[in-house]
Each structure stands twice: as structure tokens, then as C-alpha cells.
Amino acid sequence: MLLPKRVKWRRVQRGRLKGKSKGGNSVAFGEYGLQALEAAWITSRQIEAARIAMTRYIKRGGKVWIKIFPDKPITAKPAETRMGSGKGSPEYWVAVVKPGRIMFELAGVPEDTAKEAMRLAMHKLPIKCKFVKREEVGGEANES
């Protein structure tokens, strides 16, 4: 599972999930991508489950890139504990994902194989996603 080697602060505030993704919203490394359509916290276990689902389907062909990293610690207090007495200890790590973010990329496989691999990965994630293809260089210039 993914988690940071070291962090500056052990506990962080929860924050809010508003707005669209500022960066990472285009397919950069592979040919195909999995784009988030909703905002959510994606846990390191969910990322790993999606990665395993994709790599098992494409077998030895192709390459998978994970474009999100769980760098936010989520704390929890033990069960049946009274309120107060400080913030709980870090339990797991999440990646903050906003709409438009490309979470996974895939290359080196046919489009139908990539679509099915991404579909299997979508079932492991708690948000709606869509399959996207890499834009041609000319297509990106016309958008601006």
C-alpha cells in the first residue's frame, strides 16, 4: 500500500472538497486514462485494489501509471471512547481527488483491453469515473 515515507505533521485537518482539479487532468504518460467525475477521498487500499484489478486483466502486456498518491492521514479514536482527550491517532491514508483528475493511466494494450481493465478498476473505487483517451497535439492547441 502507498503511504509517505515521512511527513511534516502527523495529524492534519480534514479540509473541504470543493471545485475542480487544478492539475493532473490530462493524460500525460500513457494512451488511456481513468478520470474522476466526483470529489472524494480515495484510500491507499482502494488505489491498490484498482491497480491489482487492472494489472491482472492486462496480464504481462502494457504499463500502468498511478497518478494519485495518498498523502493525507485520517485519524480515528478507539471504539467506545469518550469525547475529548485529544485527536485520535492516524489510521489510514487518503488521496484527495477532485472532479477532472486523471487517477490511472495505461499504455501498450489495445483500446478494448484498456476499456475493460479500467472498468474493473472503476468497480474498486467509490466514485463515478470515465474512460478517456490521450488528446492529439493539434486537439489541445485548438481548445485554448
From Swiss-Prot:
<keyword id="KW-0687">Ribonucleoprotein</keyword>
<dbReference type="GO" id="GO:0006412">
    <property type="term" value="P:translation"/>
</dbReference>
<comment type="subunit">
    <text>Part of the 50S ribosomal subunit.</text>
</comment>
<dbReference type="GO" id="GO:0019843">
    <property type="term" value="F:rRNA binding"/>
</dbReference>
<dbReference type="InterPro" id="IPR000114">
    <property type="entry name" value="Ribosomal_uL16_bact-type"/>
</dbReference>
<dbReference type="GO" id="GO:0000049">
    <property type="term" value="F:tRNA binding"/>
</dbReference>
<dbReference type="InterPro" id="IPR020798">
    <property type="entry name" value="Ribosomal_uL16_CS"/>
</dbReference>
<comment type="similarity">
    <text>Belongs to the universal ribosomal protein uL16 family.</text>
</comment>
<keyword id="KW-0689">Ribosomal protein</keyword>
<dbReference type="InterPro" id="IPR036920">
    <property type="entry name" value="Ribosomal_uL16_sf"/>
</dbReference>
<dbReference type="GO" id="GO:0003735">
    <property type="term" value="F:structural constituent of ribosome"/>
</dbReference>
<dbReference type="Pfam" id="PF00252">
    <property type="entry name" value="Ribosomal_L16"/>
</dbReference>
<comment type="function">
    <text>Binds 23S rRNA and is also seen to make contacts with the A and possibly P site tRNAs.</text>
</comment>
<keyword id="KW-0699">rRNA-binding</keyword>
<keyword id="KW-0694">RNA-binding</keyword>
<dbReference type="InterPro" id="IPR016180">
    <property type="entry name" value="Ribosomal_uL16_dom"/>
</dbReference>
<keyword id="KW-0820">tRNA-binding</keyword>
<dbReference type="InterPro" id="IPR047873">
    <property type="entry name" value="Ribosomal_uL16"/>
</dbReference>
<dbReference type="GO" id="GO:0022625">
    <property type="term" value="C:cytosolic large ribosomal subunit"/>
</dbReference>
<protein>
    <recommendedName>
        <fullName>Large ribosomal subunit protein uL16</fullName>
    </recommendedName>
</protein>
